[in-house]
Amino acid sequence: MSIGVDWVDGIAVRDRFLAPTQVRALLDCAHLRRERGEFAAARIGSERSLQRRPQIRGDSNCWISAPLLPAELTLLEELERLRLHLNERDLLGLFELELHYAWYPAGAGYARHVDQPQGRAQRQVSLVLYLNEDWAPVAGGELRFFDAPDRHRDIEPIAGRLVCFLTPGREHAVLPTRRERLSISGWFRTRS
């Protein structure tokens, strides 16, 4: 499997980034962490003013941190290979990775936003890996990129699909979903 991604206007979409068995194992990890009560309602704002605003952001998340489950270790190894490749090919200076599961119940979405809030310039590449099996377009939940005031691009959340995009200034949203939607989201960062 090739580790690279091909950028088109600062966005890269890579289907089958992981094998279906690996995606299923990560889906099982997410469900296990939910059963353990490790997910919390997502909040918006800066570290000093975090607040829950479900009409803007309706997901719950769980940060991926130690102790890691075996499938999560495999994912981190694959993402490390990608990070090294991006640094070598694109000279991005990426050193760190932060990741979390994002669970959207039916009806939830995330309004238009950027992933690099003020004071967090270290986030350079955003990534989303979808875990949704048997996804159909009627289910909604697409990742929408705003390319211009009157133009956008939607990407379906299909299992095994990895979406990477250059973080600074990139406005995007998660459209409301009509069924449960699970992904792993995160950022490659420069040094803090």
Where does each model-flagged region fall?
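Non-heme Fe(II)/2-oxoglutarate
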Residues: S2-R89
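Short strand-connecting beta-turns/loops that link adjacent beta-strands
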Residues: A19, A106, R179-E180
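Short catalytic/ligand-binding loop motif for oxyanion handling, primarily in non-cytosolic enzymes
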Residues: V23, A106-Y110, A173-V174
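A short coil-to-beta-strand element that immediately follows conserved catalytic motifs
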Residues: L92-H100, A139
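Acidic interhelical loop/turn segments
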Residues: L94, Y104-P105, D150
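Conserved short histidine dyad/triad with adjacent acidic residue
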Residues: Y101-R120
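Catalytic core of Fe(II)/2-oxoglutarate
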Residues: P117-Q118, R123, N132-S192
